[in-house]
Amino acid sequence: MPGGRYLWYAGREARFYNNCYLLRLEEDTREEWAGVTERAMTCLMTGGGIGVDISRARPSGRQLRRTGGVASGPIPLLNTLNQAGRNVVQRGRRRSALYGSMNWQHDDAGKLLHAKNWHDMKVGNTTLAELKQADFNFPAPLDMMNISLNYDDAWLNNPINSTFMENVRQAMMTGEPGFSFNFGDKQDETLRNACTEITSEDDSDCCNLGSVNLA
């Protein structure tokens, strides 16, 4: 039998997408930022979860040739998708499933590593971590999204590096970011579904997990 949301929506009048979709920011342009946001929201509001790799976004502060300004970097895009997931509740009953990842050598990898350090984020006389502890739904950066760094063949040449060790430390402290390992002929398969069992290198690929009823 099909799994996941195929079963969830079985027998219901409305027809929705099912399971999760794997997305990639194909290039760092305004048009593609809008495009991946549209793809994500379409999947979310019609029943699918999403996983998105934003490694192709330019690092924050990089000069923009067309406008003369500077790039915002990939983290604001993840925050945009996080907000979409916060506000799109499927069928008014089910929260969105989100996953975001970035290559470990990206110049903004350090920012992703510490994006969920809510215990360091002051709000008045308290911290975001304490507010989240008191109210699970209190908004915080990337709180709707699982995040990971992608490790490829280049990492194998120097696995005990500062980025990886900081990733380990952060994972022990906060549980995130996670680790996505992609080696050899699979190193470009950095796209994941929200639960991360399915891998692909193709944008808009679909999770095809199934289930068997043993009852």
Task: List each language-model region with its residue ranges.
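Extended catalytic cores of very large enzyme megasubunits
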Residues: 1-215
